[in-house]
């Protein structure tokens, strides 16, 4: 998880890697004593209330979270004392820490204050029961994961910011749950190529017979060490819209989907801010699995949809940070217009240039220029 977690790990000598932190006990600090000097007087009694980690909010609450995430990454175990403070099962807690670990890794710089850490937890876990997140008037106990770490209760994100629909919105045809998106498969700020495993129920029933035969033939070729034929069969799979992807020392057959993000239009790569827009999308979804609510198939054979990743609505992030335009011609959602106005008012991203060229105007001019060149020829 980077240097911030390693700094809490200590020496690899087989001892306690985090000697001053115990989830179910309170720490004891021994002041340093140097030879020839009088011992330091006893420390005054701790006046601030101690939380379940035995620390105050202003000391090592953030370090405790970092330690727990490091421990979870190594052992898949959640803190022992957490069950005393939340109502959900241990299985649910494991899912929380998976989300927290991913959110922590993707946060730069990592949280340094209790308030920052509380915001990270709230963003990553905004879909869990509120009673598990904080103290409420209806729940005196359990106290919640924020209280477990002595963190303040932040303002929870609004539903429009980090909400994935629990039922299919009107117009959605189906949902895709992708494998992690390769950075190189992100073409610009509003489109990318994604792969969905054929173990997905929706996909498994629709794999063509010819694809099954190609996979079997490739497996046989590899057994015979005929790697030239195996590579040729991979090319045939790609032409059929499928790909064999290596995942955790295993191979997965996946279907290829070309995706167009609904309701936004990002600068083309050759336009000013084009590469910055693409890089912003890479940071949001690169190397991560995404959920795609598919509405339609466009004239170029791309699946048009809403994109969610780590509970973030990706179009919202692109619009709010000035990485894309609201494509009003094809999407009238008022929140899209509002997010674009917010970015424009704050001069974020592409709006910093004052009057950026619209990508649809740029494409029209490019088409006209090509047409003029053909007529001259």
UniProtKB/Swiss-Prot annotation:
Residues 27-38 have a biased composition (Low complexity). Ca(2+) binds at residues 190, 265. Pfam families: SNase. GO terms for molecular function: endonuclease activity; metal ion binding. One of its GO terms (cellular component) is plasma membrane. Keywords: Calcium, Cell membrane, Endonuclease, Hydrolase, Lipoprotein, Membrane, Metal-binding, Myristate, Nuclease, Palmitate. This is Probable staphylococcal-like nuclease CAN3. Enzyme that catalyzes the hydrolysis of both DNA and RNA at the 5' position of the phosphodiester bond. A lipid is attached at residue 7 (S-palmitoyl cysteine). It comes from Oryza sativa subsp. japonica (Rice). Coiled coil: none annotated. Binds 1 Ca(2+) ion per subunit.
